């Protein structure tokens, strides 16, 4: 499924705007949630540095990870008409 995240573009980093070395990032991680991220369109495109390099890459930076999870949760609630409780039923946690 295509992403439902507003402002995401497969050709540039969602966080910094770089246009080289772009990678797909599943907003909600873990085996089950990764598949759910794909199912519900909760992915963004990040450059390699914002995705997977310390200290600011989302896989190393809790603040950035939480920010993307909040954006993802809000997008899912808007797109699918979910309440916070309904989102929590699917992804196991509220990030707002």
Sequence positions of predicted segments:
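Short, charged surface segments at domain edges that flank catalytic/cofactor-binding sites
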Residues: 1-12, 35-41
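Short cysteine-rich clusters marking metal-coordination/redox-active sites
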Residues: 13-16, 47
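Short functional micro-motifs and their immediate structural scaffolds
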Residues: 18-23, 52-55
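Amphipathic alpha-helical interface surfaces
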Residues: 20-23, 42-46, 72
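Short recognition patches in nucleic-acid-associated and regulatory proteins
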Residues: 21-35
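Short Cys/His-centered divalent metal-binding micro-motifs
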Residues: 43-68
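Short flanking/linker segments adjacent to small metal-binding domains or redox-active Cys/His motifs
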Residues: 70-96
